[in-house]
Amino acid sequence: MQPVRFGSPWIMAIGLVLLLLAFVSAGKSRQRSPANCPTIKLKRQWGGKPSLGLHYQVRPIRYVVIHHTVTGECSGLLKCAEILQNMQAYHQNELDFNDISYNFLIGNDGIVYEGTGWGLRGAHTYGYNAIGTGIAFIGNFVDKLPSDAALQAAKDLLACGVQQGELSEDYALIAGSQVISTQSPGLTLYNEIQEWPHWLSNP
């Protein structure tokens, strides 16, 4: 049996196969890479207090419920943190909630703030807290839209949630006003989200 020499056709063929496999593997890795998740400030970063009770959500989550906070708007950690701290205190102390009621909140500069996050139930929408993620835009959006940065951050958060397995790939997007007695997320924002993917007109 002749020894295999460097530069022989066999070595060259094996090298080409390995090179091809490397390209295929790299392509698959790029396809599996997570979406560009938005900047998310964790609860400890905005000065949030620990939850008073731990009620976990079953994931992947089936519903996303959009709200607005009916507060002033904010940009930047300092201003948004003040609003969030006051909101959490009101929800825990006055409404007897375990935590701030929303899973995520979005400032007008497009920064996302962790509320109860993906893992814990919020208290945003009766009947949907255990099966839905509540996302609230900080501000009042009856007569106007959130900024483009805030809207894009919400879309990026949803795409990121699907990529990471937190949201079901066929999740349904709804407004709070569709399922409970509230004007949230405000008429103008309500009209906007009807054009988003996964919108469910009759929940």
UniProtKB/Swiss-Prot annotation:
Changing T182Y: Abolishes PGN-binding and activation of Toll pathway. Transmembrane segments: none annotated. In larvae, it is expressed in fat body. Also expressed in uninduced hemocytes and mbn-2 cells. The record marks T182 as: Interacts with peptidoglycan. Keywords: Disulfide bond, Hydrolase, Immunity, Innate immunity, Protease, Secreted, Signal. It is an enzyme of class 3 (hydrolase). Changing C37A: Does not affect activation of Toll pathway. Residues 1-26 form the signal peptide. Residues 59-186 form the N-acetylmuramoyl-L-alanine amidase domain. Pfam families: Amidase_2. Peptidoglycan-recognition protein that plays a key role in innate immunity by binding to peptidoglycans (PGN) of Gram-positive bacteria and activating the Toll pathway upstream of spz activating enzyme SPE. Has no activity against Gram-negative bacteria and fungi. Shows some partial redundancy with PRPGP-SD in Gram-positive bacteria recognition. May act by forming a complex with GNBP1 that activates the proteolytic cleavage of Spatzle and the subsequent activation of Toll pathway. Binds to diaminopimelic acid-type tetrapeptide PGN (DAP-type PGN) and lysine-type PGN (Lys-type PGN). This is Peptidoglycan-recognition protein SA. It comes from Drosophila melanogaster (Fruit fly). The lineage of its organism: Eukaryota, Metazoa, Ecdysozoa, Arthropoda, Hexapoda.
